[in-house]
Amino acid sequence: MTLEFSTLGLAPDFVDYMKGWDTQRELHDKVVAAEAPSTVLLLEHAAVYTAGKLTEDHERPFDGTPVVAVDRGGKLTWHGPGQLIAYPILKLKNRSGIRDYVERLEAVMIAVMADYGINAERIKGRAGVWIKADSKGPDRKIAAIGIRVLDGVTMHGIAINCNNDLAPYAQIIACGITDAGVTTMSIEAGRTITPGDIAERVVEEFRKHEEALVSSPEGALL
């Protein structure tokens, strides 16, 4: 296999955001140089707000909570305990296939959620994975995507709300969205689902897309 997986830390071993970002950048440089294989990093972060390149001032926390500015696309979001993060550091087979890459990330999450009876889907014009409006409420986001591609290798990735507290979202305009809500797998399934519960299924779903996504450059360590 050309794709590897590394668990940096799940509850109670939460990963500081800056430490995780440093790990991403170091691994990215190695993958670009063909000194390491494409790898998906799995983890839970300690609580933090991060702001993508499109974040506007009025979308920042209302209480002045510090925010980490990052080099991914997208806007402001929260990461923390109860949310599974996957950072694919992949050398893309098709360097121009960014839309296909994003759709495959969405497919990974949708398939995992289906295992728990959760009907997650894409909504046109909205990034990430969603539960469409129903008797429980309006459209609500259950997973986020924010990526960067540099020198043909991806960074950042996906965040799946498993059993995280939604209170931090009340302090921000999450992802710049004002007309929809936020939810978790646990809320939608009616039972507790943790990042540790779904991590292996996320790995299995990524494996299904490996051949289509991941380049195997000569000289890479496989």
From Swiss-Prot:
Per UniProt, subcellular location reads as: Cytoplasm
Q: Which residues form the BPL/LPL catalytic domain?
A: 34-214
Q: What is its EC number?
A: 2.3.1.181
Which residues participate directly in catalysis? 175 (acyl-thioester intermediate)
- GO cellular component annotations, sorted alphabetically? cytoplasm
Task: Check the record and name the Gene3D superfamilies matching this protein.
Answer: Bira Bifunctional Protein, Domain 2 (3.30.930.10)
Q: Which domain of life is it from?
A: Bacteria
Q: Key word Lipoprotein present in the record?
A: no
Query: Under which pathway is this protein filed?
Result: Protein modification; protein lipoylation via endogenous pathway; protein N(6)-(lipoyl)lysine from octanoyl-[acyl-carrier-protein]: step 1/2
Q: Known HAMAP family for this protein?
A: LipB
Q: Note on file?
A: In the reaction, the free carboxyl group of octanoic acid is attached via an amide linkage to the epsilon-amino group of a specific lysine residue of lipoyl domains of lipoate-dependent enzymes.
Recorded hits in PANTHER family, A to Z, give: LIPOYLTRANSFERASE 2, MITOCHONDRIAL-RELATED (PTHR10993:SF7), OCTANOYLTRANSFERASE (PTHR10993)
Q: Which NCBIfam families match?
A: lipB, PRK14345.1
Functionally, this protein is described as follows: Catalyzes the transfer of endogenously produced octanoic acid from octanoyl-acyl-carrier-protein onto the lipoyl domains of lipoate-dependent enzymes. Lipoyl-ACP can also act as a substrate although octanoyl-ACP is likely to be the physiological substrate.
Protein name, entry field: Octanoyltransferase
Its source organism is Arthrobacter sp. (strain FB24)
